[in-house]
């Protein structure tokens, strides 16, 4: 592949740190965007809409009894096929709590955390800033940090965790079948904890500006240098929207909160914080019609409509963030398990039992009323205990006494500096390493742009680590923190994290935004190594 004519502009001696810029195109960069300059300054998915079929209320008479194929506790396989005790679909506080309890009961739960269909491992808390009402954290904790602790605890007790999407499942006959993007699993019970997905407004130009000015994750994208010092807007009037508005004041010059109703629905504490913040303006009775752009194709404003008068106005804003609620991710159970008219999984009151015996639901996928992290965790506990009782009472349980897994070794604890840089190593961090590798590496260079509060970034790292390990001698991996290396991110036009870029022979080959399947990264490396 021929090098872009502008690549290498300003390349100087490699004895001092350089800044790297890169393109933000989803496929290939405009040739003028990637260059290296000399400086001695060292600084730092697929979302989908839920079909909401009409469902009737379930009753005990509608509950299905599926026949078991295993007749004794020693039966862990049928016809040579391994049958797991329990598969947990989804993560978040519900899924991880269920995994902790199931693992401590020696059930060896298999957990499919998901990463695209409906969110990322850790659920909605991965897009939450400060969690101040979860017991045990008097000073609060960020959503991603809380989920990371829960995940490590589940892993410590022996849960098998896979960051894979479940593509289909069958619960009409036992054992149940779960098909993911990479494997097929048989199991005696299922805990369904897929949570809910952020809703979109479906504006006329939403797809055009998605991740280029429109976002449903303030903590993922708000730290982008392109939003720093700009006017931003948030849509919604609940806790999610008010929390996002408050968070964005750390970066924005001013934040506009666009509320359809004549009052906020958020908690009183959140309302007080918003109303008393001079950097936030609340617009009541206001509907978002569309986004506006300038002659350069960049988002420049929002078209608003007053619901009480019908008057339309234009609001200057460089970014629009959604905080308008969620839809339950129950699609995989449609036609198999009873759902209500909004798509929530119906469970027997006070339990996690669905209309199919052996299938349990936990978290926001079955809770349309409370929707709190602590209630989701509680329902995950109930689901795990219920699954254990179900397995025991049906003589299906097989105990697994396995050693506790060691905590994953911490990687990338410090940025590469001149005296510690070693090109023979595969994995690196920071702008110095990127500059050196850009000049000297004959391999494919995979660059991951992250930010400290980005939940999906924590999802993507282990995925990329596995891919990089598979191609250990064919790739170099560099992690760039966009807050530490702001100039790189700004020049690259990085408007959200995570973002991956591939380079080879001083040429940028491709940019991939968000979290994708491992095979997409594998196929690209295989084709270019």
UniProtKB/Swiss-Prot annotation:
Thioredoxin domain location: 403-529
EC code: 1.8.1.9
Reaction equation(s) it catalyzes: [thioredoxin]-dithiol + NADP(+) = [thioredoxin]-disulfide + NADPH + H(+)
Principal subcellular localization: plastid
Cystine crosslinks: 217-220, 454-457
UniProt GO cellular component terms: chloroplast; chloroplast stroma; cytosol
Ligand binding (NADP(+)): 240, 265, 324, 344, 371
Cofactor note: Binds 1 FAD per subunit.
Cytoplasm found in the keyword field: no
Keywords: Chloroplast, Disulfide bond, Electron transport, FAD, Flavoprotein, NADP, Oxidoreductase, Plastid, Redox-active center, Transit peptide, Transport
Domain of life of the native organism: Eukaryota
Named cofactor requirement(s): FAD
The family this protein is said to belong to: Belongs to the class-II pyridine nucleotide-disulfide oxidoreductase family.
PANTHER family the UniProt entry points to: THIOREDOXIN REDUCTASE 1-RELATED-RELATED
The name this protein goes by in its record: NADPH-dependent thioredoxin reductase 3
Taxonomic source organism: Arabidopsis thaliana
Lineage: Eukaryota, Viridiplantae, Streptophyta, Embryophyta, Tracheophyta
Gene: NTRC
């Amino acid at each position: 592949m021929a090098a872009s004519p502008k690549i290498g502009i300003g390349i100087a001696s490699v004895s001092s740190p350089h800044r790297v810029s890169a393109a933000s195109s989803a496929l290939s960069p405009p040739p003028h965007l990637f260059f290296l300059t000399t400086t001695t300054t060292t600084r730092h998915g697929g979302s989908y809409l839920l079909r909401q079929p009409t469902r009737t209320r379930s009753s005990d008479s509608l509950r299905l009894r599926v026949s078991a194929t295993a007749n004794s506790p020693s039966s862990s396989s049928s016809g040579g096929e391994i049958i797991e005790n329990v598969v947990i679909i989804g993560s978040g506080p519900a899924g991880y709590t269920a995994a902790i309890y199931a693992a401590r009961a020696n059930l060896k739960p298999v957990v499919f955390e998901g990463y695209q269909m409906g969110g990322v491992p850790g659920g909605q808390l991965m897009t939450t800033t400060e969690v101040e009402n979860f017991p045990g954290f008097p000073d609060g904790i960020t959503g991603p940090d809380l989920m990371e602790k829960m995940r490590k605890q589940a892993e410590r007790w022996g849960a098998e965790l896979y960051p894979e999407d479940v593509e289909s499942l069958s619960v009409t006959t036992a054992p149940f079948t779960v098909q993911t993007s990479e494997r097929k699993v048989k199991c005696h019970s299922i805990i369904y904890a897929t949570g809910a997905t952020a809703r979109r407004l479906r504006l006329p130009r939403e797809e055009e500006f998605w991740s280029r000015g429109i976002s449903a994750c303030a903590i993922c994208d708000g730290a982008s240098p392109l939003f720093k010092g700009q006017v931003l807007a948030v849509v919604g009037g609940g806790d999610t929207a008010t929390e996002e508005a408050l968070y964005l004041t750390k970066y924005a010059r001013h934040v506009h909160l666009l509320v359809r109703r004549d009052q906020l629905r958020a908690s009183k504490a959140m309302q007080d914080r918003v109303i008393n913040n001079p950097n936030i303006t609340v617009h009541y009775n206001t509907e978002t019609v569309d986004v506006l752009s300038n002659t350069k194709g960049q988002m420049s404003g929002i078209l608003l409509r007053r619901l009480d008068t019908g008057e339309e106005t234009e609001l200057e804003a460089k970014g629009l963030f959604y905080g308008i609620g969620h839809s339950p991710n129950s699609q995989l159970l449609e036609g198999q398990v009873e759902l209500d008219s909004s798509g929530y999984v119906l469970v027997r009151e006070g339990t996690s039992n669905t209309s199919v015996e052996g299938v349990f639901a936990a978290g926001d996928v079955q809770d349309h009323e409370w929707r709190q992290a602590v209630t989701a965790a509680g329902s995950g506990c109930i689901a795990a205990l219920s699954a254990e009782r179900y397995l025991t009472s049906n003589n299906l349980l097989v105990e697994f006494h396995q050693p506790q897994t060691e905590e994953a070794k911490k990687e990338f604890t410090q940025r590469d500096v001149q005296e510690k840089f070693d090109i023979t190593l595969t994995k690196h961090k920071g702008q110095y390493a990127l500059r050196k590798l850009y000049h000297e590496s004959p391999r494919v260079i995979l660059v991951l742009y992250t930010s400290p509060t980005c939940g999906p970034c924590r999802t993507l790292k282990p995925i990329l680590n596995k891919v990089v390990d598979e191609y250990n001698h064919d790739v170099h991996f560099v992690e760039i923190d966009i807050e530490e290396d702001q100039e790189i991110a700004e020049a690259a036009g990085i408007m959200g994290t995570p973002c991956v870029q591939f380079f080879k022979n001083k040429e940028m080959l491709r940019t991939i935004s968000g979290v994708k399947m491992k095979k997409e990264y594998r196929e690209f490396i295989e084709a270019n190594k």
